[in-house]
Regions:
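An amphipathic, hydrophobic-aromatic interaction surface with interspersed Lys/Arg
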Residues: 1-253
Length: 253
């Protein structure tokens, strides 16, 4: 954190402002998401201080403050889960996953990422955000185990979350997923639109996302009976194995 001070309408203000994405708290992240898509500079000011003071700044103060937040231009390699917990409409608290997905099983991931690719963030939230397990001892996953039936029950609440909360959950997930795609570049491919060719005149086509189930089954080969074992492994463990297999296959050509 960095301390800044300035004067507005004859009154002196002091604020401790974040110097990186990792220093933002959940409320500041929500403020950024709420206005960032429309006015990034305003988002920076509101992240730094309360919005009443922020909108009262002079043009020179505005310029000076936005320079303090140039780090916000870099949304690459962000490794923090800002939305650590969510309060549902019925008052129940759902807890999120580790920023590195180390407490997310491969089965959870295949469900969550598939729904994320379809823009069904309410379902993705119901997969990754869950109630606290009664026997939690701070040494295990805080959340109750993932099940498809539990997800359906949680959807009754996640489908009622306000739009801003869903946008925050979605952006945070995309940020953390980007770290995985950068680290495991051999196995991730995204639905990027192909350029329209002048020869065919065809409309751009979207490439499909990585088919996780197909990748796993290719890796298992004849050992299909081990599928459940892989589904129970953590996301980093499976991605590491997949990446290694792909590299070996490429080098063997």
């Amino acid at each position: 954190m960095k301390k800044i001070d300035f004067e507005v309408a004859g009154k002196r203000y002091e604020y401790n402002v974040p110097e990186s994405w990792e220093e933002l708290n959940a409320d500041q992240f929500r403020a950024y998401v709420e206005v960032g898509a429309v006015n990034v500079d305003l988002a920076r000011r509101i992240v730094a201080m309360d919005d009443v003071v922020a909108v009262s700044l002079t043009l020179s103060d505005w310029w000076w403050l936005t320079k303090e937040f140039d780090w916000m231009n870099d949304i690459e390699n962000i490794g923090k889960l800002f939305m650590e917990e969510l309060t549902m409409p019925d008052g129940t608290v759902y807890y999120g996953y580790n920023a590195d997905f180390s407490d997310v099983t491969w089965e959870e991931w295949t469900f969550a990422d598939s729904y994320a690719s379809l823009g069904r963030w309410d379902i993705m939230t119901a997969v990754l955000y869950r109630q606290e397990r009664p026997d939690w001892n701070r040494e295990t996953d805080r959340r109750i185990p993932f099940t498809k039936y539990g997800t359906e029950a949680r959807m009754e609440q996640t489908s009622k979350l306000d739009e801003l909360t869903i946008r925050c959950v979605a952006l945070n997930y995309k940020m953390l997923r980007k770290r995985l795609t950068d680290h495991y570049g051999h196995i991730f491919y995204e639905p990027i639109e192909e350029e329209e060719t002048s020869k065919t005149g065809k409309k751009p086509q979207k490439k499909p996302r990585t088919d996780w189930l197909k990748l796993i089954r290719n890796m298992m080969g004849d050992n299909f009976y081990e599928e459940q074992k892989y589904l129970n492994l953590s996301v980093p463990s499976v991605l590491f194995q997949l990446e290694s297999r792909v590299k070996e296959a490429q080098h063997g050509k």
